[in-house]
Regions:
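CoA-thioester-processing core
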Residues: 89, 93-95, 103, 109-144
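Acidic-histidine catalytic/liganding microenvironments
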Residues: 47, 96-97
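Hydrophobic/aromatic residues within transmembrane alpha-helices
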Residues: 18, 55, 67, 115-117
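Histidine-centered beta-alpha loop that forms part of the nucleotide-sugar donor binding/catalytic region
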Residues: 21, 66, 105, 127
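Conserved CoA-thioester-binding segment of acyl-CoA-metabolizing enzymes
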Residues: 1-58, 91
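Glycine- (often His-adjacent) and acidic-residue-rich active-site loop
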Residues: 3, 49, 57-92, 108
């Protein structure tokens, strides 16, 4: 299990890289990761030295979407809170006053695809796939 669900770095001057880091779960987003993403992106957007934000995944994978294992035993209130924080994350990116770039590898599924589509620019590997499996899972499209 990765110690830090989100890794921050500065690959170039004035660029904040926010990497989803849950390789054991194909970078699926659980509550801890969602909160860490919101915190990291908020910090980056409030930093006047940051002029662009790069969102990516570690270990050659962008994001497998929401962590289904963490949703199985979720109460109605927890599900509502999850949806609200997911919407907050999307709104942060949508209303950002700096360019948001998503670098995708392998796949962006469900909520991961939603994160990618809200970006200003997407850079995707040749074999990258986007998928929206909500209906097959009995879910509604949720993050945007």
């Amino acid at each position: 299990m990765s110690e830090t669900s989100v890794v921050l770095s500065h690959p170039a001057p004035h660029v904040l890289q926010v990497a989803i880091n849950r390789p054991e779960a194909k970078n699926a987003i659980d509550e801890k990761t969602r909160v860490a993403l919101i915190d990291a992106i908020t910090t980056g957007l409030n930093d006047t030295d940051v002029r662009a934000l790069l969102l990516c995944g570690t270990n050659g994978i962008f994001c497998a979407g929401g962590d289904l294992a963490s949703m199985r035993e979720m109460t109605e209130q927890a599900a509502r809170t999850r949806m609200q924080s997911g919407h907050h994350l999307i709104k942060l990116l949508w209303h950002a006053n700096i360019p948001i770039v998503v670098a995708m590898e392998k796949f962006a599924i469900g909520a991961g695809a939603g994160l990618a589509l809200v970006a200003d620019h997407i850079v995707a590997g040749e074999n990258t796939r986007m998928r929206f499996p909500f209906l097959q899972l009995g879910l509604v499209p949720d993050w945007g």
